[in-house]
């Protein structure tokens, strides 16, 4: 099985790293392209995979990941669609580009899978939504799921909730990073060294995954008349929850209108 990545930025590199780490394919079975020599040199050096500046070479792979920014999708598809056939699987990694949009851009009866991973793929902890079109067989769905599970967890969804997925997982790492940064800033203001503040804040988030309901976990930390409930009280007064909800709503709206 040959895998191709058109676009070799952070997300593509995270996916390549995860797939290789699980031994799903060998290095020489992956080829990646990018717009600059600097990027493909970096990918070649770090992962030992085949690289090229020619997108049409990558488009000959059995499974082709379109990992360029949405604004370049039409241009790249126009470049490669004469090379792509009905037996290949095209995996679209872009916000705002529906399965139908990608189908129409390629034309014909292509096998299209729309996915939305997130940047925790860089540490093998991504959550990836998967939405295949009707041309993808059950066996091919299993193959795609195995690939995407190599750098985190992967779940099939209905495309009508993809905008919600983008808001709750695709973009949400940025919200968490901002939260960690704000906590670290507050710790620095209280006298903690910057590097240590980031470590404490980040580890507190990392250690919060238990499988329990978040409300239950919050209550476990909030002792009566304690310091934590005092902090929670201020967060509620300042509209912490509503800010998060409104931000995610804006994110989903942006995805719908791209």
Predicted regions and their residues:
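NAD(P)+-binding Rossmann beta1-loop-alpha1 motif at the extreme N-terminus of oxidoreductases
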Residues: 1-46, 50-53, 125-126, 188-190
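Small-residue helix-packing motif on alpha-helices
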Residues: 30, 40, 58, 193-200, ...
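Rossmann-like NAD(P)(H) cofactor-binding subdomain of soluble oxidoreductases
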Residues: 37, 45-47, 55-59, 63-130, ...
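Internal alpha-helical scaffold of NAD(P)-dependent oxidoreductase catalytic cores
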Residues: 101-111, 127-164, 177-212, 254
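NAD(P)-dependent Rossmann-like dehydrogenase/reductase catalytic/cofactor-binding core
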Residues: 202-258
């Amino acid at each position: 099985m040959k895998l191709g990545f058109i676009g070799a930025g952070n997300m593509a590199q995270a996916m390549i790293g995860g797939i290789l780490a699980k031994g799903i394919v060998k290095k020489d079975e992956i080829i990646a392209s990018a717009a600059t020599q600097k990027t493909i040199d970096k990918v070649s050096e770090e992962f030992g995979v085949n690289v090229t500046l020619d997108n049409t070479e990558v488009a000959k792979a059995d499974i082709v990941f379109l990992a360029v920014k949405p604004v370049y999708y039409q241009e790249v598809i126009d470049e490669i669609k004469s090379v792509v056939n009905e037996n290949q699987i095209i995996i679209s990694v872009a916000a705002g580009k529906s399965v139908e949009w990608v189908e129409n851009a390629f034309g014909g009866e292509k096998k299209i899978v729309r996915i939305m991973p997130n940047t925790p793929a860089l540490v093998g902890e991504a959550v990836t939504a998967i939405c295949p079109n009707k041309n993808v067989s059950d066996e091919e769905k299993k193959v795609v799921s195995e690939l995407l599970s190599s750098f985190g967890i992967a779940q099939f969804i209905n495309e009508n909730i993809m905008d919600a997925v983008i808001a709750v997982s695709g973009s949400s790492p940025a919200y968490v990073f901002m939260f960690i940064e704000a906590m670290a800033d507050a710790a620095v203001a209280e006298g903690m060294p910057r590097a240590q503040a980031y470590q404490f804040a980040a580890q507190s988030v990392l250690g919060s995954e238990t499988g329990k309901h978040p409300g239950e976990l919050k209550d476990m930390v909030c002792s009566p008349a304690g310091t934590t409930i005092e902090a929670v009280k201020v967060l509620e007064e300042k509209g912490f929850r509503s800010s998060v909800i409104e931000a995610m709503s804006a994110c989903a709206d942006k995805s719908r209108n791209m």
